């Protein structure tokens, strides 16, 4: 084999090796491109999912915050409504108190009321010795009302009572426009067993009891029946 043939054969072998190398390089490049594309797709998908989750998380937080804000606004509105309603109820009480303060103006009618209040106290206390405390301005009416109540108690119950009107202690005076201290619209406080048992039977205390009992009715009159209430007395 001469040099020409040897060189030709070497060139052929070189070309074969180069072609094999090129094919291998192309194969590696193709595989690398495929892997890169696959990895890029995987990363993109993961990032996409991550972004979606972050968005959903933020969206949920926004929705939760919206609900919290709405709930706060509703609570504020409810409190405002309740405040207005309570103010209306207080106005009702004030009007009732104004009328209550005028009851003692009619002396005959007021004396009958005093007698009935004292008699009720006798029945409630059910004691043999009772002390009555009233307003200083009612002193004259109180003596007569106490005597009449004791007589009625003896007639109805069949027992005599040792009753006295306190001449040293008095209930607060009636309401006046130029007076801001404690007031009492009238009535009495009865006590027995040296003050250990007390029956508060003032007009003011009776108004409080009536108001507590009638508050549901007053609310209904002012605002209508509650849609959430299932039971009624």
UniProtKB/Swiss-Prot annotation:
Gene Ontology cellular component annotations, sorted alphabetically: contractile vacuolar membrane; endocytic vesicle; pathogen-containing vacuole; phagocytic vesicle; proton-transporting two-sector ATPase complex, catalytic domain
| Pfam families according to UniProt | vATP-synt_E
Q: Name one GO molecular function term.
A: proton-transporting ATPase activity, rotational mechanism
Keyword Transport listed: yes
UniProt keyword terms in alphabetical order: Hydrogen ion transport, Ion transport, Transport
What does the record note on quaternary structure? Answer: V-ATPase is a heteromultimeric enzyme composed of a peripheral catalytic V1 complex (components A to H) attached to an integral membrane V0 proton pore complex (components: a, c, c', c'' and d).
The UniProt function text for this chain reads: Subunit of the peripheral V1 complex of vacuolar ATPase essential for assembly or catalytic function. V-ATPase is responsible for acidifying a variety of intracellular compartments in eukaryotic cells.
Record-stated family: Belongs to the V-ATPase E subunit family.
Q: What is this protein called?
A: V-type proton ATPase subunit E
């Amino acid at each position: 084999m001469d040099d020409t043939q040897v060189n030709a054969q070497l060139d052929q072998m070189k070309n074969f090796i180069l072609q094999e190398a090129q094919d291998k390089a192309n194969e590696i490049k193709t595989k690398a491109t495929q892997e890169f594309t696959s990895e890029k797709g995987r990363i993109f998908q993961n990032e996409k999912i991550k972004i979606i989750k972050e968005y959903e998380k933020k969206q949920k937080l926004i929705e939760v915050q919206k609900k919290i804000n709405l709930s706060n606004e509703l609570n504020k509105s409810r409190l405002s409504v309740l405040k207005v309603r309570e103010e209306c109820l207080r106005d009702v009480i004030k009007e009732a108190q104004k009328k209550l303060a005028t009851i003692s103006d009619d002396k005959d009618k007021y004396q009958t009321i005093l007698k009935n209040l004292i008699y009720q106290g006798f029945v409630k206390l059910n004691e043999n010795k009772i002390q009555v405390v009233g307003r200083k301005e009612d002193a004259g009416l109180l003596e007569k009302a106490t005597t009449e109540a004791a007589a009625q108690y003896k007639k109805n119950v069949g027992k005599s009572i040792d009753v006295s009107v306190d001449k040293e202690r008095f209930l607060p005076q009636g309401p006046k426009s130029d007076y801001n201290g404690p007031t009492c619209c009238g009535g009495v406080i009865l006590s027995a067993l040296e003050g250990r048992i007390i029956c508060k039977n003032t007009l003011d205390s009776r108004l409080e009891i009536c108001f507590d009992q009638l508050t549901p009715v007053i609310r209904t009159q002012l605002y209508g029946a509650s849609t959430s209430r299932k039971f009624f007395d």
